[in-house]
Amino acid sequence: MEWVEIDGSYGEGGGQILRTAVALSVITGKPVRIHRIRANRPNPGLRPQHLHGILALKELSNARVKGAKVGSTVLEFVPGRAEPKHVKVPIKTAGSITLVLQALLPAMAFIGGSFEITGGTDVPWSPPVDYLRNVTLFALEKMGLRAEIELKRRGHYPKGGGLVTGSVEPWESKKPLVALEWNKVDSFAGISHATNLPAHVAERQAKSAEERLREFFNAPVEIETEVSRSLGPGSGIVVWAETDSLRLAGDALGKRGKPAEVVGREAAEELIEQLTPRKAVDRFLGDQLIPFLAFAGGEIGVAEITNHLVTNVWVVERFLGRTFEVEGEIGEPGVVRVVRKAEV
């Protein structure tokens, strides 16, 4: 058996290497061995939140897995016969639902299936669920991929308890994505939420974001507010720009002692920063699209070439050979081009 060998400490050196590598193992049918997992981190090895994505992909592909335990620095994943199924992922804590989806979505695109994931929907260090639903899926649909993500209940740090369900149809017609620059912003939209908190929190976040965006752009702004109940309190906001190309976004989370006005303004300022280079893809979407672009083809202009993006390109090319050309330095705007489209 020939392994694809991956150094888990390369580049960004975190959970993303695991998510992308195991997803590509499922897609290509190639077994993968990842060693030196998170070797440069204060607490090396697999963390609980990484296991959820790995085990979900194990179930989807009937894989044989060795080393899938907390603290393990080596993981061996041998995919079996993948078939569409309903995958349940119960994250007992506020572990990120969207990071599990970053592993599941590319794999399910080639197989089909549905999912039900409990955990954190709006938690630090991961994209909020409203980002995936409104920005990521919007771009994937342009590439011919049909997927649905439904938010049933919010989950915040530390209690979690969020619930997300959805499905992915097998990706039959892959369309190249050419999205280099935007020429005009048609409008702004967003979702501002408050969970187990007064409605005025969501309203103030939305108002503050809207005011900030209007200082820079003369375009309509429509941010909806959502008030709900869950296991614990929390708030957040995602705002996105509808451009003549794709959607770009900014987001922010509330926390105790942080005024709602500051939360709203932070999200708006992050979005303005993403729009400034006039590239079609924001820095967060850039790295998420890499596994899909490899099979669909195309080229994208990104507001910032991140370490995550470069690391994702490296992982994909371990499986598929040279696929991409990246123009631009880390921390700067740039272009990612597919030079050789992969077939499965």
Curated annotation (Swiss-Prot):
Family matches, as InterPro entries: RNA3'-term_phos_cycl_insert, RNA3'_phos_cyclase_dom, RNA3'_phos_cyclase_dom_sf, RNA3'_term_phos_cyc, RNA3'_term_phos_cyc_type_1, RNA3'_term_phos_cycl-like_CS, RNA3'P_cycl/enolpyr_Trfase_a/b, RPTC_insert
GO CC field: cytoplasm
UniProtKB keywords: ATP-binding, Cytoplasm, Ligase, Nucleotide-binding
Disulfide feature: none
Catalytic residues as annotated in Swiss-Prot or TrEMBL: 308 (tele-amp-histidine intermediate)
GO biological process, one term: RNA processing
Matching PROSITE patterns: RTC
Signal sequence, renumbered to the chain: none
Enzyme class: ligase
Binding site for ATP: 102, 284-288
Chief place of localization: cytoplasm
EC annotation from Swiss-Prot or TrEMBL: 6.5.1.4
Catalytic activity: a 3'-end 3'-phospho-ribonucleotide-RNA + ATP = a 3'-end 2',3'-cyclophospho-ribonucleotide-RNA + AMP + diphosphate
GO molecular function: ATP binding; RNA-3'-phosphate cyclase activity
NCBIfam families registered for this protein in UniProt: RNA_3prim_cycl
Function: Catalyzes the conversion of 3'-phosphate to a 2',3'-cyclic phosphodiester at the end of RNA. The mechanism of action of the enzyme occurs in 3 steps: (A) adenylation of the enzyme by ATP; (B) transfer of adenylate to an RNA-N3'P to produce RNA-N3'PP5'A; (C) and attack of the adjacent 2'-hydroxyl on the 3'-phosphorus in the diester linkage to produce the cyclic end product. The biological role of this enzyme is unknown but it is likely to function in some aspects of cellular RNA processing.
Protein name, as recorded: RNA 3'-terminal phosphate cyclase
Source organism per UniProt: Thermococcus gammatolerans (strain DSM 15229 / JCM 11827 / EJ3)
Taxonomy of the source species: Archaea, Methanobacteriati, Methanobacteriota, Thermococci, Thermococcales
